[in-house]
């Protein structure tokens, strides 16, 4: 049995060992938010996940809805500008869209920049008027991001 001081040291060591990852996209409204949500849901003990955008476009309600369908609550997420997170010493910055990859700022420290592109759900959905078909576009990308977090993320780190 560990005493309180030993437990505190163990928790501090675990916190130090956790990787800090930023998921970056254009507006921090959809893809990067989904990636942050899935990472916190699936790998909270291994990774401190953040998301941001080159700009802030507000949280996409369709993204919130389809993530909630899988038990991931993003209702309290906010759209964050990457400039507000430059003080954090990230281990990895993962760009999830081409615009963010091309305009990724320079991060202090040793952050490794990785690009893993996903389709843009709002752009895919704009050709549909039917709500169900729009949501299907978001579900497709939601599921692709989940597969990436579950099956490929660890191999990149």
Predicted regions and their residues:
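N-terminal amphipathic/basic-hydrophobic helices that include classical n-h-c signal peptides
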Residues: 1-16
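Conserved active-site segments centered on acidic
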Residues: 13-84
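Short glycine-rich anion-binding loops that position phosphate/pyrophosphate groups of nucleotides
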Residues: 27-29, 98-101
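Residues at the C-termini of beta-strands that transition into short coil/loop
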Residues: 53, 97, 117-119
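Glycine-rich nucleotide phosphate-binding loop and flanking beta-alpha elements
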Residues: 74, 100-103
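Conserved acidic residues
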Residues: 91
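Phosphate-binding/catalytic loops
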Residues: 103-157
């Amino acid at each position: 049995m560990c005493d309180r001081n030993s437990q505190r040291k163990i928790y501090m060591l675990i916190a130090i060992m956790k990787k800090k990852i930023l998921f970056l996209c254009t507006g921090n409204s959809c893809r990067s938010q989904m990636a942050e949500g899935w990472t916190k849901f699936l790998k909270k003990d291994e990774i401190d996940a953040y998301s941001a955008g080159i700009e802030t476009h507000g949280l996409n309600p369709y993204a919130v809805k389809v993530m909630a369908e899988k038990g991931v609550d993003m209702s309290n997420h906010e759209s964050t500008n990457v400039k507000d997170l430059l003080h954090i010493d990230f281990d990895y910055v993962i760009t999830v869209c081409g615009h963010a990859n091309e305009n990724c700022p320079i991060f202090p420290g040793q952050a490794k920049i990785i690009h893993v592109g996903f389709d843009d759900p709002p752009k895919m959905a704009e050709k549909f008027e039917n709500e169900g078909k729009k949501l299907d576009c978001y579900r497709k990308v939601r599921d692709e991001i989940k597969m990436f977090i579950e099956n490929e993320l660890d191999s990149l780190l």
